[in-house]
């Protein structure tokens, strides 16, 4: 990376100077609006995402693999509200002027990059998890620790993307101490590609493949259920017997005493059953045809988990769509200013797209409440207990 300064061209916190929105000497109308809006936004992010974390931790019905990633996403939003938003609002109230130390600015930039990247990487991790769950469900169900490892990987990669900022990348000659931004244009391009422009297409591709595979699985399951339905005769003639439908007796001799006295056949060895005096065309009673219940119970348990996960997946396109709607304008403006220093971008536009990106942190709990009945009922229960 080079050391070309991006001062005045904006970073993840807009990076505006005193000339942009105000003089920095008083709390004008724009500063008051920023203060009120910032306090409301911080309160909504803290309340909503805390409710998500408490609900998943306290209710077993919400403790699914998908919701573990949602908790990680909520944790990123909570950290953003605690570590980034207060200083961002402070800068906005001052009209874009940074009055604190440059070292604090660098820490703020690094936290902003890391948490924004963590949000995107968590959504990518959900797409990977859902893709594996749909394409190789049997192997997926046996790997209970994979979700935690994937979540840990998202945070480590996010920290790696943000690390250059705290390692001195922002310490460039002639730095303006009144502007808090990313100073290196090469790093702005690098972080934008790693944090947004590379993972987002991959995430969308995985979601497309996941929902396509899910539709195929449901179609195959529907066809299989119909093929197992009892067949009714379409015309005169002897009824067609279905060996899976109840007991049919055809010229069978009486059962042996061992069969009459034994309450279940599952305790008999297979050799006893193979010596049954039935003719090849006859069928034994239901008891003799009983199968061990363990595989069936496992299949039913897997079906229940799959059904719950399918319900959880319905909210994911809305979460991803809201994220892209809120953050795409910011990253487009962000990388445009880095690649085209001569291009003029209004400071007010920079401020608007930055606010829009941060608003996304407050949207996810609202989305869960509207589009997920399980979250909605648990939210109500949790709020009643806390009030």
UniProtKB/Swiss-Prot annotation:
Na(+) binds at residues 77, 119. It is a multi-pass membrane protein. One of its GO terms (biological process) is associative learning. A lipid is attached at residue 387 (S-palmitoyl cysteine). It is found in: Cell membrane. Residues 258-268 have a biased composition (Low complexity). Keywords: Biological rhythms, Cell membrane, Disulfide bond, G-protein coupled receptor, Glycoprotein, Lipoprotein, Membrane, Metal-binding, Palmitate, Receptor, Sodium, Transducer, Transmembrane, Transmembrane helix, Ubl conjugation. GO terms for molecular function: dopamine binding; dopamine neurotransmitter receptor activity; dopamine neurotransmitter receptor activity, coupled via Gi/Go; epinephrine binding; G protein-coupled serotonin receptor activity; heterocyclic compound binding; identical protein binding; metal ion binding. Polyubiquitinated by the BCR(KLHL12) E3 ubiquitin ligase complex: polyubiquitination does not lead to degradation of DRD4 protein. Palmitoylated. Palmitoylation of the C-terminal Cys is important for normal expression at the cell membrane. Residues 58-67, 129-146, 209-314, 370-387 are cytoplasmic. Its main location: membrane. Pfam families: 7tm_1 (PF00001). It comes from the Eukaryota. Residues 224-278 are annotated as: Disordered. Residues 1-34, 91-106, 171-186, 338-346 are extracellular. Central nervous system: hypothalamus, thalamus, olfactory bulb, and frontal cortex. Glycans are attached at residue 3. Disulfide bonds join 105-180, 340-343. GO terms for cellular component: axon; axon terminus; cell cortex; cytoplasm; cytoplasmic side of plasma membrane; dendrite; dendrite terminus; dendritic microtubule. The keyword Lipoprotein applies. Forms homo- and heterooligomers with DRD2. D4.7 allele exhibits higher affinity for homodimers compared to DRD2 heterodimers, while alleles D42. and 4.4 have similar affinities for both. The interaction with DRD2 may modulate agonist-induced downstream signaling. Interacts with CLIC6. Interacts with GPRASP1. May interact with ADORA2A. Interacts with KLHL12. Belongs to the G-protein coupled receptor 1 family. This is D(4) dopamine receptor. The gene is Drd4.
